[in-house]
Amino acid sequence: MSDQVLSALEHFFLRWQRDGEARRGLPLCEWEADWRSPCELDEPREGRVAWRPHQRQQAADFAAMANALELVLHPAAQALFGHWFSRPIPCSYKGLRLEIILPWNEADLNLLRENLIGHLLMLRKLKRTPSLFIATTRNEMTLVSLDNESGQVWLEWLDSGRRLTLAPSLPAFLERLETLPH
């Protein structure tokens, strides 16, 4: 499963880069001296820096997080969050605009872990099955999530607990994403 996720993610990044760079060149983001990333390509100019998703040399370890939660994290989530650094990637899935969530640097990965822990604890308190958010939508109460048990990708309404299956797996979801301008 992890290899399939990594392959689908890499293909998505390549499509996103090709389409975006053909339209506007390299993506730019605000440069922050105390929030550097291996994604940065050049020196900053006028407070902005060009960037691209950057593959980590060594996968991030989620064992401590899983042990603290007494939960086995789905390998697809570990593959998604543990192998690349990136800004959020704007895209769409069957017309639904969203941003794939990925960590920008090691400190951001730690914040992501903390937010995932909070999300999982909230779901546990509400007696819902565990899911891991993987993308945001325009509605802050609606997330794209990975079902931690089955690996299905859901559209999840946090306020009601409603869940709609978008794809049978994370690789299938990633393969159907459409790129948006960056």
UniProtKB/Swiss-Prot annotation:
The keyword DNA repair does not apply. InterPro entries: Syd, Syd_sf. It is a peripheral membrane protein. It comes from the Bacteria. It is found in: Cell inner membrane. The keyword Cell wall biogenesis/degradation does not apply. Keywords: Cell inner membrane, Cell membrane, Membrane. It holds the Pfam family Syd. GO terms for cellular component: cytoplasmic side of plasma membrane. Interacts with the SecY protein in vivo. May bind preferentially to an uncomplexed state of SecY, thus functioning either as a chelating agent for excess SecY in the cell or as a regulatory factor that negatively controls the translocase function. Belongs to the Syd family. NCBIfam families: PRK04968.1. This is Protein Syd. It comes from Aeromonas salmonicida (strain A449). The lineage of its organism: Bacteria, Pseudomonadati, Pseudomonadota, Gammaproteobacteria, Aeromonadales.
